[in-house]
């Protein structure tokens, strides 16, 4: 679990890979991957950072931990691999997108198109044991992903943080630079979406902010596969 980051995240996060917490985490993961089924695949763990460089990050959508079913997780929060049924929270995200922009709900949950446009799809925990939600919570990933948020907070160029639900909103304390923007609501989960996610218009809010900054807006439409 060494620093495999090829883009500008590599030098920024290099000190983390040398820290005691990360060494313990790496040892834990080595054991987990050899004795259990763990998601995502090792080579996909850092995909959020690989697809969306530090310099190119415009938006952060913060998730919790990866999907724990077969072939779902591939290192991007909320996203699933092609050919996999769209999970309920993502389906609600698509419904809100349809209500905002009139886009048809796509036949897949593959969000790489967002990541390639500067939407950092970051989970706070980057691995999970099959069938056991939150099984890698408290093992060290939170220190690592907090550092990612802190580094973005230090950036001069504003970032838009989308915080859905209490877990994501707990990270607000790391976002102290007033240049940045925070968009928050309840989580898109079926348990809470009707209590304020639907109608919150996060996607058009993002694009309004980007337009006001003179930045290219995000094309949120996910194509059918």
Swiss-Prot record:
<keyword id="KW-0234">DNA repair</keyword>
<dbReference type="InterPro" id="IPR036895">
    <property type="entry name" value="Uracil-DNA_glycosylase-like_sf"/>
</dbReference>
<comment type="similarity">
    <text>Belongs to the uracil-DNA glycosylase (UDG) superfamily. UNG family.</text>
</comment>
<keyword id="KW-0963">Cytoplasm</keyword>
<keyword id="KW-0378">Hydrolase</keyword>
<dbReference type="GO" id="GO:0004844">
    <property type="term" value="F:uracil DNA N-glycosylase activity"/>
</dbReference>
<comment type="function">
    <text>Excises uracil residues from the DNA which can arise as a result of misincorporation of dUMP residues by DNA polymerase or due to deamination of cytosine.</text>
</comment>
<dbReference type="InterPro" id="IPR018085">
    <property type="entry name" value="Ura-DNA_Glyclase_AS"/>
</dbReference>
<dbReference type="InterPro" id="IPR002043">
    <property type="entry name" value="UDG_fam1"/>
</dbReference>
<dbReference type="GO" id="GO:0097510">
    <property type="term" value="P:base-excision repair, AP site formation via deaminated base removal"/>
</dbReference>
<keyword id="KW-0227">DNA damage</keyword>
<dbReference type="Pfam" id="PF03167">
    <property type="entry name" value="UDG"/>
</dbReference>
<dbReference type="GO" id="GO:0005737">
    <property type="term" value="C:cytoplasm"/>
</dbReference>
<feature type="active site" description="Proton acceptor">
    <location>
        <position position="65"/>
    </location>
</feature>
<dbReference type="InterPro" id="IPR005122">
    <property type="entry name" value="Uracil-DNA_glycosylase-like"/>
</dbReference>
<protein>
    <recommendedName>
        <fullName>Uracil-DNA glycosylase</fullName>
        <ecNumber>3.2.2.27</ecNumber>
    </recommendedName>
</protein>
